[in-house]
């Protein structure tokens, strides 16, 4: 598809001119004071997700110019090409069809194949979850990257829907300090091990799988080799390699499923084991609802596209190089780590689709922590630091602590949830309003003694304010709403990547380190350092000693 790069459009030039004028001087407090309808004008409702974008550094003019940029970059036709299965991952010659994994039967390419694997996987899930028959009480998922981050994020998020008596464990790091404590107290006869690797060759995953196999055989005793077939399963396309390992239960997926978009596929096996077939299908349905919103909503009300446009405005015109994710729900504590891979592995690119170096920035650094923990860690910098860092708050209206919460705890837990939500709103409000030096002077002075005069102390207690934030609201954290939220971020990433003119679906930056690691491994045994740079040679010698 022949589309202009964003910086070559008239809309880009118009945005640059706008930034040099009113856009650079934008003040949230002034904007809200001048427009009583700003909240309504800059709020959007998508499936399962409400978004308040009113506390961001944009006005109607800015948004209109950004929508013009989207149209001049042909974002709608590029979106349609992805959804139709065109090979938009051009460096690998592949389609990008994670949306097909959650589409109803017959509604997307490869539907029969997708639903064949899904039905088989969920039938297996129900067998394992019948713990009285299967005898399985623990599931150990071994994977890394997309084979780990997605399931490890979703399982705790949906804890209220999880089956009690079946405990999930995740192992990813090649460091033995990851797997050793997981296996330490498990009984092989009560454990299912999932090996999640598309090729069944991923270094870290296969190293951990071999350790798990050794542990299993040693602990199981007589008949262990034969029992591997019952106690191991694999999410892989390399059935032959899995069979050689002793695994006969395998669930495959396709080369058009990128790792960081794969939790909807057989990689989601541990999710389905945790929450069951019905809830896994609800997760898929929620994501599909967001897919349809992305595919059909006009640009003016299309939430993924609006967020992608805001990302471009912040990164390329206002110069904000970082974004903090603050989910005010402990179940979403792994979401920032998941989004780090989704966004930074997708859009951390420095060349355009033709391989030309980009003259502008792309992906911001994405980081964060669950609220309120983050307030006591890094929010100081958000409020008074020298960098402006947009914050993305995620709030859940109604708590769900699961069906097994004791009655005597319910009132206290409900009160805690109100406190949680109040903290969320207070932080977004404080970032916007700030505190003037005059206000700080009228506040009661700190009780700690100080030799500083009142004005100096007040300056230390001044907040600049005008710090931007968005707030996403879910009514409940359910399989459907979580599916929609994840899909929202996926489509937002594609939107900003398409506007930047990059391929969001390869990850060549990961490959060089893998190749060099394979070259270095034999040197740890031999000590040979010929041809290495002085730093690597010196570190090799120190680490071998």
Curated annotation (Swiss-Prot):
Q: Which UniProt keywords apply?
A: Cytoplasm, Gluconeogenesis, Glycolysis, Isomerase
Note the SS bond partners.
none
Enzyme Commission code: 5.3.1.9
Q: What is a single molecular function from GO for this protein? A: carbohydrate derivative binding
Q: Which residues cross the membrane?
A: none
- Keyword Cytoplasm appears in the UniProt entry: yes
- Catalyzed reaction equations: alpha-D-glucose 6-phosphate = beta-D-fructose 6-phosphate
Pathway in which this enzyme or protein is active: Carbohydrate biosynthesis; gluconeogenesis; Carbohydrate degradation; glycolysis; D-glyceraldehyde 3-phosphate and glycerone phosphate from D-glucose: step 2/4
Judged by the first EC level, this protein's enzyme class is isomerase
Q: Which GO terms describe its biological process?
A: gluconeogenesis; glucose 6-phosphate metabolic process; glycolytic process
Q: Which NCBIfam families match?
A: PRK00179.1 (NF001211)
The function of this protein is:
Catalyzes the reversible isomerization of glucose-6-phosphate to fructose-6-phosphate.
Instruction: State the family named in the UniProt similarity comment for this chain.
Output: Belongs to the GPI family.
* Listed name of the protein: Glucose-6-phosphate isomerase
The organism encoding this protein is Leptothrix cholodnii (strain ATCC 51168 / LMG 8142 / SP-6)
The encoding gene? pgi
């Amino acid at each position: 598809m022949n589309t202009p790069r964003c910086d070559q459009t008239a809309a880009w030039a118009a945005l640059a001119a706008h930034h040099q004028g009113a856009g650079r001087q934008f003040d949230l407090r002034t904007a809200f004071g001048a427009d009583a309808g700003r909240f309504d004008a800059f709020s959007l409702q998508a499936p399962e997700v409400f978004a308040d974008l009113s506390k961001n550094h944009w006005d109607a003019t800015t948004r209109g110019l950004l929508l013009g940029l989207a149209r001049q970059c042909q974002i709608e036709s590029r979106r349609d090409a992805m959804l139709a299965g065109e090979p938009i991952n051009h460096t690998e010659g592949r389609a990008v069809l994670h949306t097909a994994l959650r589409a109803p039967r017959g509604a997307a390419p490869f539907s029969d194949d997708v639903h064949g694997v899904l039905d088989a996987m969920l039938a297996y899930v129900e067998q394992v979850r019948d713990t009285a028959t299967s005898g399985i009480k623990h599931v150990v998922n071994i994977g890394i990257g997309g084979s780990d981050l997605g399931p490890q994020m979703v399982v705790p998020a949906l804890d209220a829907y999880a089956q009690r008596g079946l405990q999930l464990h995740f192992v990813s790091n090649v460091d033995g300090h990851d797997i050793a404590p997981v296996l330490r107290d498990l009984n092989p006869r009560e454990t299912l091990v999932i090996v999640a690797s598309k090729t069944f060759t991923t270094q870290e995953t296969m190293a951990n799988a071999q350790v798990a196999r050794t542990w299993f055989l040693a602990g199981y005793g007589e008949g262990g080799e034969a029992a591997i077939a019952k106690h191991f399963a694999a999410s892989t396309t390399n059935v032959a390699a899995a069979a050689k390992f002793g695994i006969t239960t395998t669930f495959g997926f396709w080369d058009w499923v990128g790792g960081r978009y794969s939790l909807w596929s057989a990689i989601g096996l541990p999710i389905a084991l945790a929450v069951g077939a019905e809830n896994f299908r609800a997760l898929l349905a929620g994501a599909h609802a967001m897919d349809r919103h992305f595919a059909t909503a006009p640009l003016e009300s299309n939430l993924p596209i609006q967020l992608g446009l805001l990302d471009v405005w912040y990164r390329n015109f206002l110069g904000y190089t970082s974004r903090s994710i603050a989910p005010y729900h402990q179940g979403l504590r792994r979401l920032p780590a998941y989004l780090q891979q989704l966004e930074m592995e997708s859009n951390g690119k420095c060349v355009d689709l033709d391989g030309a170096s980009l003259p502008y920035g792309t992906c911001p650094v994405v980081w964060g922590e669950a609220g309120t923990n983050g307030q006591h860690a890094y929010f100081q910098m958000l409020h008074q630091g020298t960098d402006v860092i947009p914050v993305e708050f995620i709030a859940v209206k109604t708590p769900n602590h699961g069906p097994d919460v004791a009655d005597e705890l319910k009132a206290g837990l409900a009160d805690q949830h109100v406190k949680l939500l109040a903290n969320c709103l207070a932080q977004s409000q404080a970032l916007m309003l700030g505190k003037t030096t005059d206000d700080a002077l009228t506040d009661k002075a700190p009780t700690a003694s100080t030799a500083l005069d009142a004005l100096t102390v007040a300056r230390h207690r001044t907040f600049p304010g005008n710090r931007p934030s968005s707030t996403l609201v879910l009514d409940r954290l359910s399989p459907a709403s979580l599916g929609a939220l994840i899909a929202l971020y996926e489509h937002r990433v594609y939107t900003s990547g398409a506007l930047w003119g990059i391929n969001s679906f390869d990850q060549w930056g990961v490959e060089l380190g893998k190749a060099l690691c394979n070259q270095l491994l034999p040197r740890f045994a031999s000590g040979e350092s010929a041809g290495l740079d002085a730093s690597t040679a010196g570190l090799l010698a120190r680490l071998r000693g």
